[in-house]
Amino acid sequence: MNRASLEKDPHEVASMFDGVARRYDLTNTVLSLGQDRFWRRATREALQLSPSDKVLDLAAGTAVSTVELAGSGAWCVAADFSVGMLAAGAARDVPKVAGDATRLPFADGVFDAVTISFGLRNVVDHSAGLREMARVTRPGGRLVVCEFSTPTNKLFATVYKEYLMRALPAMASAVSSNPDAYVYLAESIRAWPDQAELAARIEAAGWSDVRWRNLTGGIVALHAATKA
C-alpha cells in the first residue's frame, strides 16, 4: 500500500500495524501530547458499562483500550486484524481475538456494547463494518465510535492541519519504527468525513439514536448509537 493511498487492502493495513506494534502505545502518547489517555477514559464513560455487560473492543490493537474498559467491571474482549498488535499486548490480561471487522467471528446479538477507537478509518468497507457491529450487538445494545474528526474552530482547524501534515510526520520519525504509517494516518484523517457525515453513515448502517460529542476541540469525536 502506497503511504499516500487511502485505497486500503486489509492485509496491507494489518501488515502496516504489525510493523509499528512494538512502539505503538508510546508513539500514540507522544503524538497526541498525552490526550490518548483522556480519549480512552471518555470512551469508557460514554459506554455507560455495568459489571454484567459483555463488550467488544474492536480494532483494539495492543488492548490498552480494552483494559480501560475492563476497569468498569464488564467482561471485555479485544479484537483486531493485526496479529502483531495483539501480540504486543500479550501481557495485558484480557481475552484477545484476531478478526476482520467486516466478518466478525461472533454469533448474532452476543454483546451488550461494541466500541471501536481510531480504527473505523482503517476498515476497508466501514459501512459493512458498522453493519457487522450491529449484527453482533443485542437489541438495545450500544455503540461508541471514537475517531479523529473535524475541529469546530476554523483557526484551530488550520493550525491542526499544519500539525498533521508537517509536525506529526517529523515527530513520528523520531519515535516510530515506521514513520510512513503516520503519514498515512495524517492523510486518512484529512480524508475522513466530519461529525455530521459520520453520524449519517452510522444511521444508514442500521443504528438508531445517533449523536456525537466533540473532544479536544473536535480533533476527536465520540459517536454513540443504539441498536433498535
Swiss-Prot record:
The keyword Repeat does not apply. GO terms for molecular function: demethylmenaquinone methyltransferase activity. Pathway: Quinol/quinone metabolism; menaquinone biosynthesis; menaquinol from 1,4-dihydroxy-2-naphthoate: step 2/2. CDD domains: AdoMet_MTases (cd02440). Methyltransferase required for the conversion of demethylmenaquinol (DMKH2) to menaquinol (MKH2). HAMAP family: MenG_UbiE_methyltr. This is Demethylmenaquinone methyltransferase. The lineage of its organism: Bacteria, Bacillati, Actinomycetota, Actinomycetes, Mycobacteriales.
